[in-house]
Swiss-Prot record:
The family this protein is said to belong to: Belongs to the tospovirus envelope glycoprotein family.
Source organism (scientific name): Impatiens necrotic spot virus (INSV)
UniProt-recorded name of the protein: Envelopment polyprotein
Residues the record marks as site: Cleavage: 459-460
Notes on the domains: The cell attachment site present in these glycoproteins may help in the adhesion of virus to cells.
Length: 1110
């Protein structure tokens, strides 16, 4: 009996739908070009329409797309076959049986059945797919903007704008045939996260609206989106060509959004639109700015005051008439009333006689707070609202109607009910009130090579022609160009890249020789082995600094092909990302102020001991005072970040299985060994079933009973968009990024618990108080696509245990641990009488990704991997103490004896003016003495106005905010206490770097807004209130700020006491009508009183006053 081919097809069940796959064709022993030709040959059909499986031992593959001679003998010469001449079932999906297997943001993965064979296809369009099963999931159209995959997990949270099916051609040992946009190739399918790609320029528009930017691109189409980190933006992509204006909404300006456009990313800074509009409208007028910014509060207060008095009068007048309403409201709020009255007996600031509120002085009212009896000491002992004793509580039942009426009618209860009524009426009233061209190669004059086209073209290039439009011949000593359109021949000197001897690596022809001449051997090799379908002519890659080779691979990524994961990760870095440069290093306006007193004097230096809690965002502004110095000197310590650095080792990557590709072969007779002759063992995920030919399960022309075998393998399609990388923890170290500013300049540095930081005048060290965060040495952690770290039950490498961590892959999706052979629990098979056999794959290898729900998220803050071996995890709690030792020479606090001499003065700046980022300046000079100095400069404000100059070389980092370019302007260095000794430093150079960030970078009002925020901050106001007590507090050393607070509290109480006395006297004077009562001075004298009739009365005059004793 002869072995016979079967039209086997595969039925794969995954999720809630079946998946069908075609036979795999395999010949992986030849190079990449021959593999594609092998696939094309297998698609040829014979005259009967039967698909033939070619015999590996006899098949011959010819160069230049030639196929072997036909077995029928009809042709005696090789025939050149074009790809377009081959039958392509993927393009005929509308007339064939097809099924949609996966839909991404940019393409679709579907399969078509033709003559009993299933073909896998990927397409960027939905043309002719309307009749396919599952077509209801298709969108109206796919996005056509250029994108490239994101293989670096850290970038997915910020840059991902959707998903796309890709073909990975680098995994040669696991490839299978696939068609992408009708182009056949061998590879593996993978679903990847993607980001925009392309040349895009982001610039601020010079119009009145300061929230509008302009986006410009030389490409035919480009995409942009304003994305909040971690959000899904696949349905918010906006495409454009040329240029477009974008106006940010108030929601976009919350400091958590990024503008993504092509290869660039720009963070939308935090901007309060209401504040910025007022700053611009009322520039340089802080009172109008304050009124404008807080207008809503002023308006609310004014309306509330206008509404309050009429409502108050109405409620007081109707409280007795509408007592039923108050009873109903009291019944609703009875628990609250009961609690308030109960707690009042324990309130310390109440009068012991009448029970009313008493702060300092108090005049008792006629009625007690219970509003029932007269106020007296005897009644206060009986009043249940004032006194709480066990005997009195027994007399009252809190659920009785008597107790209810008592609680409702107390002064506390009645005031509460009136307040609730006033609030409800107020809300009711207020609610009704209105409120370039891509990289090309030129021969000599008008003949070019353009990526994506395998023909020589002229400068009239529109699309890739069918034949050469010109020709470029590389000779030994010259280059000859022939233009077929103009019949002009030009000869020029040999100017190729030297030393490009690569004949053994490439197949030479005229075009390849020319490409090697202009770009070198490496590019010529990939040009021949990895062609481009679409050259993306307008894309230059200048933003990412791509050379010819890297630009070619980037365009391959745009075409849906991943060649090398390592190169792809390098392309993941985004240009123009001003995320860090926008953040102010030291936001000192929100820090508390302290006076710093020296701890000791060592070798003529004042030693200051500073201790700060190791907490992110904390800091202190220290003032250094000395009797000999005229002004206090400022020293700012800012703990910018506190985080734990974990050193890890990468174990593997795991990802969910999106679908499965299966190939198998059936024999009528024989065993597995016979089947394996046609379907060799691949090394993993192989299977073989025998017998598969028996009564009721035979194929046509097969009469065998209890014979035959079905063997094959399966390959998974992984969803790398949801991949996790598994690491093992090796080591943990606490690190802190600390910034200092003040008279020692401005700089940021990193302090580790292992290595202290020492520079200039200070030394910084960490006293760690590590909190256990659940991560231990040797523990496995998972880094997810959301940039968070997870811990839990995770399988170790090469461990088949049923825990999260399978399938185990390399970071590029290459299986590194899997089953060699599938057992009976992993698959099932079925057949029909005189029909086709089907294989159902239950599980193609280990799959435990669903167990990710059992993992625990370690931190709410996303982590950032610095490389594959370490990452940082920020902490929101204190990790210990930061200790700084500051040693300052005593000369800094003394008046200089002479005018200092500065030499080798250098002052250079770079950055922008009229922007919030400012100019970052580096100053250096050599001084002959040590002194403290003040800095001033016209048209500029400085990050620090005081510096400490030491004898010898000095270097400082300063930030200047200027209204104009300060180049060639003078900075005045004024020694402490004597302006006559001032020296000047000239600004040597200013490199203006206008960042491509937006809104506040080119805004002339940015500095004014910063100044307003600083002047109106809570800390500034609090410091202003305490300032009258600075003189007294300065005598208490390090308790300076504490003494100021204590004195302020005492002053407030004294003022309240005085005001209370004055108010009591005035109230009594008015209440007793003393201003109407005459004072009758009657000591020993008397007056004649009139008789009852009132007649004959004589009044005695008062004797004259005697002033002799005065």
């Amino acid at each position: 009996m002869a072995l016979k081919e079967t039209d086997a097809k595969i039925h794969v069940e995954r999720g809630d739908h079946p998946e069908i796959y075609d036979e795999a064709y395999y010949d992986r022993s030849v190079d990449h070009k021959n593999e594609i030709l092998d696939t094309l040959a297998e698609m040829l059909q014979n005259a009967t329409g039967k698909t033939l499986r070619p015999t590996r031992d006899t098949q011959t593959v010819l160069a230049n797309n030639e196929v072997p001679q036909s077995s029928s003998g009809l042709s005696s010469t090789p025939t050149t076959i074009s790809i377009m001449d081959l039958p392509n079932p993927c393009l005929n999906a509308s007339s064939l049986t097809c099924s949609i297997k996966g839909v991404s943001t940019f393409n679709v993965y579907y399969q078509v059945e033709s003559n009993g064979v299933i073909y896998s296809c990927i397409s960027d369009t939905i043309t002719k797919l309307g009749n396919c099963e599952g077509s209801s999931e298709l969108p109206r159209s796919f996005e056509t903007v250029p994108v490239v995959p994101i293989t670096k997990i850290d970038n997915k949270r910020k840059l991902s704008i959707g998903t796309k099916f890709y073909i990975i051609e680098s995994l040669e040992n696991y490839n299978y045939p696939i068609m992408y946009n009708s182009r056949p190739t061998n590879g593996t399918v993978s679903l990847q996260s993607v980001k925009f790609s392309g040349d895009c320029k982001i610039s601020k528009t010079n119009i009145v609206n300061s929230y509008t930017v302009s986006l410009t691109t030389p490409e035919k189409i480009m995409g942009y989106v304003v994305k909040r980190e971690g959000s899904d933006m696949s349905h918010s992509i906006i495409s454009f060509s040329g240029s477009v204006s974008l106006t940010f909404t108030e929601e976009n300006m919350d400091g958590k959004h990024n503008l993504l456009c092509g290869d660039k990313s720009s963070k939308v800074p935090l901007v309060d639109k209401r504040v910025r509009d007022c700053i611009i409208k009322y520039s340089k007028n802080i009172y109008k700015q304050t009124a404008c910014i807080n207008f809503s509060w002023f308006r609310l207060i004014m309306i509330a005051l206008i509404v309050y008095f009429p409502i108050r009068y109405l409620v007081n007048k109707t409280s007795k008439t509408l007592f039923y309403g108050y009873d109903l409201l009291g019944l609703i709020t009875y628990p609250i009333l009961l609690l308030i009255n109960y707690l009042w007996s324990y309130f310390p600031l109440k009068c012991k006689v009448c029970g009313n509120l008493c702060l300092v002085t108090h005049e008792c009212s006629k009625l007690c707070i219970c509003n029932k009896n007269k106020a007296s000491e005897e009644h206060s002992e009986e009043c249940p609202i004032i006194t709480r004793t066990a005997e009195k509580n027994k007399k009252y039942n809190w659920a009785s109607i008597e107790w209810f009426h008592l609680i409702v009618n107390t002064k506390i209860g009645l005031s509460f009910l009136k307040a609730v009524t006033e609030t409800l009426i107020g809300f009711l009233i207020l609610s009704q009130m209105p409120m370039s061209m891509a990289q090309t190669a030129q021969c000599l004059d008008s003949c070019y090579y353009v990526p994506g086209c395998d023909r020589f073209v002229t400068n009239r290039y529109d699309k890739c022609p069918e034949k050469d439009q010109c020709f470029c011949a590389i000779k030994e000593n010259s280059i000859v160009e022939s233009n077929f359109l103009t019949n002009v021949v030009t000869e020029g000197p040999m100017d190729c890249i030297p030393y490009q001897e690569c004949k053994g690596r490439i197949t030479e022809n005229a075009l390849v020789t020319f490409v090697k001449c202009r770009f070198g051997c490496e590019y010529a090799s990939i040009f021949q082995s990895k062609p481009l379908d679409n050259g993306f002519l307008e894309y230059s890659g200048d933003t990412l600094g791509l050379n010819a080779v890297n630009l070619h691979f980037m365009k391959r990524l745009r075409n849906g092909i991943i060649d090398f994961y390592n190169k792809t990760e390098k392309y993941g870095y985004i240009s123009g990302d001003a995320l860090k440069s926008n953040e102010s290093d030291i936001p000192e306006s929100i820090f508390p102020r302290k006076s710093l007193i020296f701890d000791s004097v060592i070798d003529g230096k004042y030693r200051y001991m500073i201790e700060e809690s190791l907490l992110s965002g904390g800091g202190t502004v220290f003032s250094l005072n000395d009797k000999s110095s005229s002004t206090a000197q400022k020293f700012v310590v800012y703990i910018k970040k506190v985080r734990i650095q974990y050193d890890v080792s990468e174990q593997y990557t795991t990802a969910p299985i999106q679908s499965t590709h299966t190939d198998f072969f059936s024999t009528c007779t024989g065993k597995c060994s016979d089947c394996r002759k046609e379907q060799p063992i691949t090394g993993y995920q192989d299977f073989c079933i025998t017998p598969t030919s028996y009564w009721g399960c035979e194929e046509v022309w097969c009469l065998a009973i209890n014979e035959g075998a079905t063997c094959g393998f399966c390959r998974n399609v992984y969803d790398m968009d949801q991949s996790f990388r598994i690491y093992s923890v090796i080591k943990s170290t606490i690190k802190s990024e600390v910034c200092i500013s003040g008279f020692v300049g401005a700089k940021c540095f990193t302090v580790s618990e292992e290595v202290p930081s020492e520079s200039g005048y200070f030394q910084a060290d960490i006293l760690a108080d590590f909190h256990n965060d659940g991560l231990t040495i040797g523990q496995l952690i998972a880094h997810g696509p959301d940039s968070h770290v997870y811990a839990g039950n995770i399988a170790r490498l090469n461990n088949p245990s049923k825990m999260f961590g399978h399938p185990q892959l390399s970071h590029q999706g290459d299986p590194i641990f899997s089953k060699k052979t599938l057992d009976t629990n992993d698959l099932s098979w079925d057949c029909s009488a005189i029909g086709k056999k089907t294989i159902t794959i239950k599980s193609c290898g280990y799959d435990t990704y669903r167990f990710k729900t059992g993992l625990n998220q370690i931190s709410d803050i996303p982590v950032q991997f610095t490389d594959q071996n370490s990452f940082y995890m920020e902490k929101i709690f204190s990790l210990g103490k930061l200790k700084i030792v500051l040693d300052l020479p005593s000369e800094l606090f003394k008046t200089v004896p002479k005018k200092p001499i500065l030499s080798s003065v250098s002052l250079s700046c770079k950055g922008c003016f009229l922007c919030s980022q400012g100019l970052r300046c580096a100053a250096s000079f050599i001084s002959d003495i040590t002194f403290s100095a003040r800095l001033t400069m016209k048209q500029c404000s400085l990050s620090t106005y005081q510096i400490a100059v030491k004898k010898g070389a000095n270097k400082y980092n300063l930030t200047m905010f200027c209204t104009s370019n300060p180049e060639k302007q003078k900075m005045i260095i004024e020694p402490e206490g004597d302006k006559s000794y001032s020296v000047e430093a000239l600004v040597d150079s200013v490199a203006v770097l206008e960042p491509e960030n937006i809104i506040d970078q080119n805004d002339q009002h940015a500095h004014e807004e910063q100044q307003y925020n600083s002047d109106t901050s809570v800390w500034s106001f609090w410091d202003y209130v305490k300032s009258p007590f600075n003189f007294i507090a300065s005598h208490f050393g390090s308790f300076f700020d504490t003494v100021r607070v204590v004195l302020l509290i005492l002053f407030v109480f004294a003022l309240a006491y005085l005001c209370s006395i004055v108010a009591t006297m005035c109230r009594g004077y008015v209440r007793n009508k003393s201003y109407k009562t005459k004072y009758i001075e009657d000591t020993n004298d008397y007056s004649l009183v009139s008789t009852s009739s009132g007649k004959d009365t004589i009044t005695r005059r008062r004797p004259p006053l005697d002033f002799s004793g005065i």
